[in-house]
């Protein structure tokens, strides 16, 4: 029954805590009034008052105590959603997790070359234990679970060493993502520059064509004006000749 309850706690998203209903505008105003009153009575500044609150030496009365954030637990772990969580975000060691560590070096001191050597050793041990498992099953099948546990321990050690590469993998993934974004931005900039140059060239062609057309129109106008002047002169000359 206890195991079933723990599974339910771990699997289901819990409802909000019952004290969420105390977070009202009126209670928030009352909390500010209480802080100011406590500050005046104790003759301390606001920083000291907050420090006193963190030390849990004084608490607001009634419902107001739920509005003050709780103090961080003194332990290294806390329970949330049915599981234990560590305050320090780091990969727990095999010994801390209750498993036997098959290599000697510490996770924080082990070098990359040593990790590679240890992985090769563990892979050799994994293959050897698998062959031993086949031999045990062929001779005494009831003893197979011992070798299964050995294989499980080796695989857990391999998985733990691989997990130590997670920070490096995260950095490399971030670098690849940033490089990809930079390349995309550069391609976009080059496309914009190319489009801008095409538009500029088209505008220049339009301007040149319009200028040439204006020049031709002006030339035609000049030619027609000259023809009209010559016709007028010819008519005037004929009239003068007739009068003579």
UniProtKB/Swiss-Prot annotation:
InterPro entries: Med7/Med21-like, Mediatior_Med7, Mediatior_Med7_sf
Pfam families hit by this protein: Med7
SUPFAM superfamilies referenced in this protein's UniProt entry, alphabetically: Mediator hinge subcomplex-like
Keyword entries, A-Z: Activator, Nucleus, Transcription, Transcription regulation
Keyword Chloroplast attached: no
Transmembrane segments: none
Cellular localization per UniProt: Nucleus
BP GO annotations: negative regulation of transcription by RNA polymerase II; positive regulation of transcription elongation by RNA polymerase II; positive regulation of transcription initiation by RNA polymerase II; RNA polymerase II preinitiation complex assembly
Presence of keyword Protease: no
GO CC terms, sorted: core mediator complex; mediator complex
Domain of life: Eukaryota
GO MF annotations, alphabetized: transcription coactivator activity
Recorded family membership: Belongs to the Mediator complex subunit 7 family.
Subunit comment: Component of the Mediator complex.
PANTHER family registered for this protein in UniProt: MEDIATOR OF RNA POLYMERASE II TRANSCRIPTION SUBUNIT 7 (PTHR21428:SF11)
Role of this protein: Component of the Mediator complex, a coactivator involved in the regulated transcription of nearly all RNA polymerase II-dependent genes. Mediator functions as a bridge to convey information from gene-specific regulatory proteins to the basal RNA polymerase II transcription machinery. Mediator is recruited to promoters by direct interactions with regulatory proteins and serves as a scaffold for the assembly of a functional preinitiation complex with RNA polymerase II and the general transcription factors.
Protein name: Mediator of RNA polymerase II transcription subunit 7
Lineage: Eukaryota, Fungi, Dikarya, Ascomycota, Saccharomycotina
